[in-house]
Amino acid sequence: MSVKYIFVTGGVVSGLGKGITAASLGRLLKARGVHVTIQKFDPYINVDPGTMSPYQHGEVFVTEDGAETDLDLGHYERFIDENLSKNSNITTGKIYWSVISKERKGDYLGGTVQVIPHITNEIKDRIYRVGKSERTDVVITEIGGTVGDIESLPFLESIRQVSNEVGRENVMYIHVTLVPYLGISGELKTKPTQHSVKELRSIGIQPDVIVCRTEKYLSQDMKEKLSLFCNVPEGAVVQNLDAEVLYEVPLMLEKEGLAKIVCKRLGLECKEPDLDEWEEMVRRQKNPKSSVTIGLVGKYVELHDAYLSVAESLRHGGIGNDVEVDIRWVNSEEIENGEVNSFLQGVDGILVPGGFGDRGIEGKINAITFARENKIPFFGICLGMQMAVVEFARNVAGLHDANSSEFGETPYPVIDLMPEQREVDEMGGTMRLGVYPCKINENTLIKGIFEDELIYERHRHRYEFNNEFRDTFIKNGMTLSGLSPSGKLVETIELKDHPWFVGVQFHPEFKSRPNKPHPLFKDFVRAAYEYKTK
């Protein structure tokens, strides 16, 4: 059977949830025995989001093979429960970089390099490459941005050409659009969707399905109107209401018949969907037996998407324990002067996630001190682990001016730049990225959580525990519970005299799934609930 291609575009406004729609469709097709992979094209000129501000872009999601990608890839992996690769996130910057490099090598034989055909051919090559490199029946491709944006035009032209090259029977276009509700008149308005589809058709793409994001139910008359003006079958107008919980969206789209429409349109051999596990997971999330409050201490907390995978992983841990996780977002800058108690009083656990730069660092250290002294479950990730090391050095080991060398001169650089990073000049894509093994020591909390001796986790860092201080930390009560197989890199730390105090250099949030919570997040939430009920 030929590989099938589904393209998901967006109209009217950005932020409608194209990524969630694509991921949900992937889950529904996988439930029918279809092998699915997903990719996203982003129209910005950055090569990847690795050097972009979290305030502009949200979190950077890291794949197994070390690609720094859009946060939507996190949604894709969590929904379809598959590991994606660097081929799954392509930017305008990557496309132009590749084309210009080929031109410099003389690959175009002296021809004039143009958007059509050279840029569009490069885009199509990235689409086909995923279909060839992955064992897949269907490639779902999300086109970032909004129809009508000048930046998206080469991508839209490329996906138009794909249908000519592989056959219209092997291609499907899904357009996600907004049907706004005007409270003053009590009406849903279809005109924005009509104009968005008109714009899409003007460049040669006729959508096969329109997914309507709306806060109110679409009436049958409304669906008939959209069908008429947008030239799609009436049954292909799918409503996508606001969901109570994120992972309910696939079930809502299943009721709307989206996957059946896709299977019929593309001629896919689909079995009856097996969504029992997913339905049970959603039921558990919507009906918790209790709740815990986790204080998430970071410097980008105004934009929750900056910590999207961490927040979702906490919720996964909650599902695994049948408790609801309420996240208390704490700006680390606001607790730099010692006002910790008023911000963290009453929390059942404290999590300090990853990050870069010295802004808000002292607030994170204050939060860690609060967790350590009050025996509150603590979880430090990447920079969070590093700051736990600094806090311990200052307040337990007697190294009062200890710090990370990332933040300036210090007599005790307990966190230091990795040796292989010392000669690196460029910022983008040069960190220790992707999956690396970690060997867990016996008789440790981490060993009890994982059971396995060797685990594989994703990383994104330049700095590490300074081995010159190992003996000092061990002597003062810190356990270095996980190391790289060579024994050179400290991967995990914990405290002997604390019920649950764990720091990890890696990013476990990138491997957590709603139906398969990461063991660390699941046990952290368990410990938080135990702390609450003791």
Swiss-Prot record:
Keywords: ATP-binding, Glutamine amidotransferase, Ligase, Magnesium, Metal-binding, Nucleotide-binding, Pyrimidine biosynthesis. Mg(2+) binds at D72, E142. Pathway: Pyrimidine metabolism; CTP biosynthesis via de novo pathway; CTP from UDP: step 2/2. Gene3D superfamilies: 3.40.50.880, P-loop containing nucleotide triphosphate hydrolases. Disulfide bonds: none annotated. It holds the Pfam family GATase. This is CTP synthase. It comes from Ruminiclostridium cellulolyticum (strain ATCC 35319 / DSM 5812 / JCM 6584 / H10) (Clostridium cellulolyticum).
